[in-house]
Amino acid sequence: MSPDHEPSIPDTADLGLRSDCGSCFGLCCVALPFAASADFAIDKDAGRPCPNLQTDFRCGIHADLRPRGFSGCTVFDCFGAGQKVSQVTFGGQDWRRAPGTARQMFDVFPVMRQLHELLWYLAEALTLPAARPVHADLRAALEKTEALTRGSAQELTALEVPAHRGEVNALLLRTSELVRAAVPGRKKERRGADLMGARLKGADLRGANLRGAYLIAADLKGADLRSADLIGADLRDADLSGADLTGALFLTQAQLNAARGDAAAKLPETLSRPAHWRPAGDR
């Protein structure tokens, strides 16, 4: 574990924030829409099952999603919301056997995903020693958010998620400030910046504020992103080969999945190296 992080209970495993597709009713393959693009081979409306979804709720082309034009599927991460909706909110009753629940189940899924994403950030914030001054508030927010995920389908669809997200975000901002303040040197403030295609090879971005930055196709090879705040940063097709992301704040698996990289990149221990990343030194 990075020295900038410390253990905390509950952690992401306790909160069920890892996707368990075997316990889900293929909700991301049905509930969400997508359009034919570089990420998806076809158009699909919300609520319509993807033609690749099998009767057992498994993907029929899972091993070949990228070559078949469905790279967007390999990027998506529900933070465990799929199995929570399937097994907890709807008690293991699937939308095929109980079609009357389908619309409500599909409406609940994106709400649950947002709540689980917030839980991911809050759980991470609670592992950060520098954020101890706000740990009590963070834990209270985590407990409140977790309680919301246990609500009924009706309660979840009626939830004002933006208002709750705003409350949580204020705490995450404070957490970020506390952690990045401990990083020596002048920190770059690039929140929401347009850095699409930017040449940042080898850049010193330690403690940088890159919240919501557009880093699409940016060259970040060998960049030092330790303790940089990457919440909401768009890393699609960014090259993270050889970059140091240890201790990066609020980085998610979906962001890594959307980027390019290699075996030399250093990642937070809570995240996995995407299967499509290259071996070290392979160009």
Residue ranges and their predicted role:
Residues 173, 181-283:
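Tandem repeat scaffolds
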